[in-house]
Amino acid sequence: MSTNGTLSKPEFPANAASKEYAASLDAADPFAGFREKFIIPSKANIASTKLAKPGLSSEPCIYFCGNSLGIQPKATQKYLEAQLDTWSSIGVCGHFTKIEDSPLKEWQNLAEQAAESMSKIVGAAPEEVAAMGTLTMNLHLLLASFFKPTATKRKILMDWKAFPSDHYAIESHLAWHHLDPKETMVLIGPDEGTYEIPTEKILSYIDQHADEAALILLPGIQYYTGQLFDIPKITEYAHSRGLIVGWDLAHAYANVPLKLHDWDVDFAAWCTYKYGNAGPGAMAGLFVHEKHGQVDYSEGEDAPKFRHRLTGWYGGDKSVRFKMDNKFKPIPGAGGYQISNPSAIDLACLCAALSVFDETSIAELRKKSVLMTAYLEYLLLKDTTDESRQFQIITPSDPAARGAQLSLLLKPGLLHKVAHRLQEAGIICDKREPGVVRVAPVPLYNTFTEIWMFVQQLKAALEG
């Protein structure tokens, strides 16, 4: 079983390259109404350097950058105002007082409100998810708990082009254990001249290093190429060879269906500001499988046994959290990995974003996403050849091996010119050195007509 099962690639009729056809797809879109739940930046505002209120310009930009930062849900202002009103009106009482007409729980239970909604997105029990921290911080906490090198098993396997923060985190944990990263960090990359890492190659690396590797950490979706890895197959195989398995789901969360519990993933972490739309630097999430989150009181209430982790008071069970007796009794599950009192303001933004997902499911959103990305690919490749195109799509063509993003590797020297031309045309997408434009139509708020318009502008920029 692959991460998303077998997906048939959509096929398009002869008139699919017309704007009218794109409009017909929009007319039939069951998610069209969700676009109204978001504030789309305007062309005028993205060209301005002054603080502006949304809605002052009626012409929206084309925002294909949800793989870097999602746009603001309209619910965010409502949730933030409710939180600020609670703080201003009752102060510290907000920790325990449930406000009847607020969309938010009291502060002591607010992280659980977010975790419950996130658990549906990642395919986990609510107790296996915690809303806390930021992505790299959470990876550090998880690695501190799960990376237990021995004299023989001390290597960590990861992908060759991991997001730099992941790379730094792994290096620092190896150094923390007095290990040389040059000897103990194993990078798995594609074959020369290619960009996709075949699942079989990952499995072969696991075989090659199984006797010396303690842990493997991979991205659910590779941030640069957009490749979606076969999470269940890799996890099952790594477990069979004795490795702990962790996943960085920064680009998979709220993008593709996940079943972390059923896939027996040991731990995972993700940010919520990309496809999750929770805001820049928003509070992140982590997953710890229930088998690792158990608390054993068989030797008495004062001698709980649990998986070692770095601890803080907010990971303590609520029944003893305020006793101040310095006897740590962790919350069972991922909640026991919490450290400090989380920001209620940040949680308000996260809960606002999650309220949109509570109205649908990732499985349903995925259907539209597969169609959108396939349509983008179709328009990009139509009436061109590998020789005539000034770009190469380095994202896998198989819908089951990618999410919303297509990564376009431009010919040398084109990146900055093309990115500038696109922004002048009111199109926001992400560029990554040395030459990649990452384009991510998001099913919650993007349209097929926008995809058609983007391709016209990209072709003009490449020809100009």
From Swiss-Prot:
Q: Which reaction does it catalyse?
A: L-kynurenine + H2O = anthranilate + L-alanine + H(+); 3-hydroxy-L-kynurenine + H2O = 3-hydroxyanthranilate + L-alanine + H(+)
Name one cellular component (GO) term: cytoplasm
Q: Which UniProt keywords apply?
A: Cytoplasm, Hydrolase, Pyridine nucleotide biosynthesis, Pyridoxal phosphate
Residues modified to N6-(pyridoxal phosphate)lysine: 274
* Chief location category: cytoplasm
Q: Where in the cell is it found?
A: Cytoplasm
**Keyword Transferase among record annotations:** no
Which GO terms of type biological process are on file? 'de novo' NAD biosynthetic process from L-tryptophan; anthranilate metabolic process; L-kynurenine catabolic process; L-tryptophan catabolic process to kynurenine; quinolinate biosynthetic process
Q: What cofactors does the UniProt entry give for this protein? A: pyridoxal 5'-phosphate
Query: What InterPro entries does its record include?
Result: Aminotrans_V_dom (IPR000192), Kynureninase (IPR010111), PyrdxlP-dep_Trfase (IPR015424), PyrdxlP-dep_Trfase_major (IPR015421), PyrdxlP-dep_Trfase_small (IPR015422)
Record-listed pyridoxal 5'-phosphate binding positions: 135-136, 163-166, 248, 251, 273, 313, 341
Source organism superkingdom: Eukaryota
One GO MF term: kynureninase activity
Q: Which Pfam families match?
A: Aminotran_5, KYNU_C
Documented EC number(s): 3.7.1.3
Q: In which pathway does it act?
A: Amino-acid degradation; L-kynurenine degradation; L-alanine and anthranilate from L-kynurenine: step 1/1; Cofactor biosynthesis; NAD(+) biosynthesis; quinolinate from L-kynurenine: step 2/3
Q: Which family does it belong to?
A: Belongs to the kynureninase family.
The record's listing under HAMAP family reads: Kynureninase
- State its role: Catalyzes the cleavage of L-kynurenine (L-Kyn) and L-3-hydroxykynurenine (L-3OHKyn) into anthranilic acid (AA) and 3-hydroxyanthranilic acid (3-OHAA), respectively.
- Enumerate the PANTHER family for this protein: KYNURENINASE, KYNURENINASE 2
Assembly and interaction partners = Homodimer.
* Name of this protein: Kynureninase 2
Q: Which organism is it from?
A: Aspergillus fumigatus (strain ATCC MYA-4609 / CBS 101355 / FGSC A1100 / Af293) (Neosartorya fumigata)
| Record gene name | bna5-2
